[in-house]
Regions:
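Metal-associated gating/positioning segment near the N- to mid-region
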Residues: 1-48
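Short, acidic/polar
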Residues: 3-11, 61-71
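Gly-rich Lys/Arg/Thr-decorated short loops/hinges at beta-loop-alpha junctions or inter-strand turns
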Residues: 19-24, 50, 126-135
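Short catalytic-loop micro-motif centered on adjacent basic/acidic residues
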Residues: 24, 54-57, 160-165
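Short, ordered loop/turn segments at secondary-structure junctions
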Residues: 26-28, 58, 84, 114, ...
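Histidine/acidic residue-rich metal-binding segments in metalloenzymes
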Residues: 65-233
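Short beta-alpha connecting loops at secondary-structure transitions
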Residues: 206, 247-252
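Gly/Ser/Thr-rich active-site loops/lids in small-molecule metabolic enzymes
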Residues: 251-264
Length: 264
């Protein structure tokens, strides 16, 4: 949505935040799930991006042939899989489909890890006008159960994967025991903010997926970072208009800017 940001302004924001290279996600409008759309995005980037860049290709359960077409193109940094639904329409929640994708590409696959079945059944916990209920809806188990399955599939497929924006102490413990095929990242938002204060002060502006959780989880993320055991600090850059974020929860979109504020 270029009303929020475009390739030029996004890359300038990255440079302002001290970032010289960006990997842009495929959950655009439309989602980048075909070679034609990927090439169109690459073409748009020429002469507009002010930093080094590459683009993720969006996986769907039925676009493996498109993945094979795109993976060798210069400018494709990897494949993105949304195991749980988030911002945009991309979703691959069936474990058999996930493993087929793992086996289909030599590119690194990065995962948004939340259990879609649990997100559906727990949606009743997202209370109208109460942004702090976001972490109740998308609770620890929705993330942990998904990440556990991804690790199992990676070990089975012997495929190296990357799990994005880890938020829970339980996931950290699990991931540190399973490093052979799995790398992972955390975001500044989850390292700095914590519930319930963030929701009291920021409301829907603190709403993101996976959600910001309590102090116990934040402290574990910080300690793991201090020990040098976290592979990447990722921005999870997801800007929205104020008019969108000011909507009553849960109609408000999840996500917040990240590249210009990655590190102080």
């Amino acid at each position: 949505n270029t009303k929020k940001e475009n390739l030029k302004t996004g890359s300038l924001a990255a440079i302002a935040g001290g970032i010289t290279s960006v990997f842009d996600m495929p959950n655009n409008k439309p989602s980048i799930t075909t070679k034609k759309l990927f090439m169109k995005k690459l073409q748009k980037a020429k002469g507009r991006m002010h930093c080094n860049y590459a683009f993720y290709f969006g996986a769907e359960k039925d676009n493996i042939e498109e993945i094979k077409k795109v993976e060798k193109i210069r400018g494709c940094c990897g494949v993105k899989v949304f195991v749980g639904s988030s911002t945009g329409t991309l979703l691959v929640s069936d474990q058999a489909d996930i493993e087929r994708i793992m086996k289909s590409t030599k590119k690194m696959i990065s995962f948004h890890s939340e259990n879609e079945d649990m997100l559906i059944t727990r949606k009743k916990y997202a209370k109208t006008g109460r942004p702090h209920s976001h972490q109740v809806w998308r609770n620890v188990d929705t993330a942990l159960s998904s990440t556990r399955k991804l690790i199992k599939s990676a070990n089975k497929s012997k495929k190296k994967i990357h799990v994005l924006h880890i938020t829970t102490a339980e996931e950290i413990k699990l991931l540190l025991r399973n490093r052979k095929y799995v790398s992972f990242e955390v975001t500044p938002q989850h390292l700095v903010l914590a519930s319930p204060d963030c929701y009291k002060k920021l409301g829907t502006y603190a709403q993101m997926n996976p959600p910001i959780r309590g102090v116990r989880h934040r402290n574990v993320l910080r300690k793991t970072l201090q020990k040098g055991q976290i592979d990447i600090i990722g921005s999870d850059h997801a800007p929205h208009l104020k008019s969108e974020k000011n909507q009553i929860y849960p109609n408000s979109p999840s996500g917040m800017p990240g590249v210009q504020t990655l590190l102080p």
